[in-house]
């Protein structure tokens, strides 16, 4: 997994994932290049916008992205987690989860289930080739 956090909500979510499920996660920088498939976790800014660093990172690594998850705040109404919808549409990758602020235990379970489904699907594809 890769992630970007601004206020700390995404970072707290990722840290909880690491503690609960021992997953590997990399906080992206402007220069991050990924050599393996990944799921990216980010946040929504402004009125449903994608953070610029996330957009640039995924553009550079778009052939390896397998899904996105996004933090948001429901007080934004229709703009809640909208960055996830935008990333999903732009890069033709599934939106795996929208979670509020730093998420819940149920959100942690949900993202792990989604990752397992992706891994299972990729294993079947590898075996078919």
UniProtKB/Swiss-Prot annotation:
Ranges that cross the membrane: none
Family: Belongs to the NrdI family.
Pfam families found in the cross-reference section: Flavodoxin_NdrI (PF07972)
NCBIfam families: nrdI
Role this protein plays: Probably involved in ribonucleotide reductase function.
Protein name as it appears in the record: SPbeta prophage-derived protein NrdI
InterPro entries, A to Z: Flavoprotein-like_sf, RNR_Ib_NrdI_bac, RNR_NrdI
GO biological-process terms attached to the record: protein modification process
One GO molecular-function entry: FMN binding
Superkingdom to which the source organism belongs: Bacteria
Gene expressing this chain: nrdIB
